[in-house]
């Protein structure tokens, strides 16, 4: 399995494309649906699903257009689903002065320990509240999509609607107890759980 990164949108959000043979899975299609679709067409990849780590506007701006073009199912954390249509929760007006909502109805609302099969992997859902009420991470055999919970030498904001410093601290502690994996965050460069354990003195 290969993982490619596109940095998209006004907040430079990482959109990840997982590829196995001729199939693809998207994580957080932030913006620029045309660019994402161009990539899929160039590679002749069939899109099998779209995963959201949370429902802030900068992680889901291309969802509707991509679903319309491909019919791919949307997987959304159930506790964060209200943010798909609520601009107060998805922060679109707060950051851009424009409201944004996702009209696509999720095919699957994800809960703790659910798995998403793809290729030779089963991505496991780990609830990681703190940045938002319903943030999740997706754990693979040797990688972790951490959304805005864990960054390279940092972590997501909690001074926003739905944020909780206490919950984020608990989520970070949980992630840092996992076996070492490459971490693909919502913003910035990849890291590893081993490096972050050292950085946080865990």
Stretch-by-stretch model annotation:
Residues 1-43, 137-147:
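Conserved beta-strand hairpin/beta-sheet module of binuclear metal-dependent hydrolase folds
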Residues 32-117:
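Active-site HxH/HxHxD metal-binding segment of metal-dependent hydrolases
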Residues 4, 51, 75, 108-110, ...:
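Hydrophobic/aromatic beta-strand patches that form the interior of the parallel beta-sheet core
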Residues 18, 53, 128:
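Conserved S/T- and glycine-rich ATP-binding loop of Class I adenylate-forming
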Residues 29, 60, 168, 172:
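Aromatic/hydrophobic pocket-lining residues that form the small-molecule binding cavity
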Residues 29, 54-55, 78-79, 140, ...:
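Short secondary-structure boundary segments
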Residues 1-3, 118-122:
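Conserved N-terminal entry element of GNAT/NAT acetyltransferase domains
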């Amino acid at each position: 399995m290969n993982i490619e990164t596109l940095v998209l949108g006004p907040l430079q959000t990482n959109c990840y494309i997982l590829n196995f043979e001729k199939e693809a899975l998207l994580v957080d299609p932030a913006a620029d649906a045309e660019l994402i679709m161009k990539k899929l067409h160039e590679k002749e990849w069939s899109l099998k699903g779209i995963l959201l780590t949370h429902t802030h506007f900068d992680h889901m701006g291309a969802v509707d257009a991509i679903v319309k073009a491909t019919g791919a199912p949307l997987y959304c954390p159930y506790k964060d689903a209200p943010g798909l249509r609520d601009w107060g929760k998805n922060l679109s007006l707060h950051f851009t002065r424009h409201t944004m909502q996702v009209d696509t109805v999720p095919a699957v609302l994800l809960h703790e320990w659910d798995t998403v099969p793809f290729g030779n992997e089963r991505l496991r859902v780990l609830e990681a509240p703190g940045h938002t009420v319903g943030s999740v991470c997706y754990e693979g055999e040797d990688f972790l999509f951490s959304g805005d919970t864990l960054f390279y030498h940092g972590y997501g904001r909690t001074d926003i609607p739905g944020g909780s410093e206490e919950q984020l601290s608990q989520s970070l502690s949980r992630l840092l107890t996992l076996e070492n994996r490459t971490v693909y965050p919502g913003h910035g460069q990849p890291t590893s759980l081993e490096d972050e354990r050292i950085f946080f003195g865990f």
